[in-house]
Amino acid sequence: MSLTEPERARELVGKAREAEQRGECARSHGLYDDAIALLDRDSDLALLADALRWKGTLHREQGETEAAYRCYKQSLVHADRCGSLAARAHGYNCLAIVAQRRGNLTESERLYSEAADVASKAGEVRLLGMIEQNRGVLMNMRGNFVGAEARYSNSLAAFERANDDEAVSWVLNNLGMLYTKLGHYQRAIEIFERALVIARKRNDALVESVLMLNQAEVWVAVGKLDEAEAACRYSLEGARTRDDHLTVAGALKCRARIERERGAYDQSIATLRIGIFEAEGLEDRLLQAEMLREFGQTSRALGNSAEARLAWVEAAESFEGVGARHEAAEIALLLGSLPAN
């Protein structure tokens, strides 16, 4: 018995999500496009809204922020037309993540609030946990580490009660990053190891790649450069296979730091130039600021105070622009350590 077009579209969407989880991003995009083309613009609105949003998230995870934004906006149009509160709430949450990446934290917080309100009305418990986690990321950016940890812990407990391993791995990644920033390296290592077990059990190549990269940052911090290099290389190779520009840029930043720690300053500068170029089209202001901070560190190590100053001044402006007060204060101290002009 042949499938109807909506049934065929639903099957294609399922295959797209499976391909995405395996890291087969090009195949996933193609399957989403095939599904979207089959769906009727009058009768299949709920699935159309979901498919567009999931395709947008794939774009977002690859660093294609504007493409993600367009998909999310289209998804919301169809969600409004069919009256799906759940699809609307998910759409607002996704747009909030885009606003956060672009450094518009006020708009991001507004959208998270709207998403939470609609999700509550729709009874979307899992989404409320995701929003709680995302608000924790905002707090982390703003330097409210106690608040961020509380948000993460709340969402983690909710996802653990629901046996939602996928969501648990997301929250553990954010907790690991927070503990790395705070210098709680052993806790961060334990958190990342736990998350990696989950990601590998689920064959989730995307999450595993991100976790490996964030774990590499911990290895650098504790001086285990060989382990850091291996983790960074794994993440970079996987990201390049997926055309994941966001993770590629982050991995290049990490590799440049490893090179700097080993005294290969010229190579570190060359790697950072490639990374900065890779990051230019991503609209991720925080990542761009982190790249500039690294560029300043290596320039200072080379004895080039003028280049270091230029990079750190721009980094400080970017950190302040996204509300990252903790990082902006660190840059101010670095600038103060440079010799006067």
Model feature map: region roles:
Residues M1-T4, R8-K15, I274-F277, G281-N341:
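C-terminal non-catalytic interaction modules
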Residues L178-E290:
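Eukaryotic tandem repeat interaction scaffolds
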Residues V13-Q21, L47-E61, A86-R101, Y112, ...:
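Conserved alpha-helical positions within TPR/SEL1-like repeat arrays
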Residues I36-A37, L76-G83, E114-E124, N154-D164, ...:
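Amphipathic alpha-helical segments of tetratricopeptide repeats
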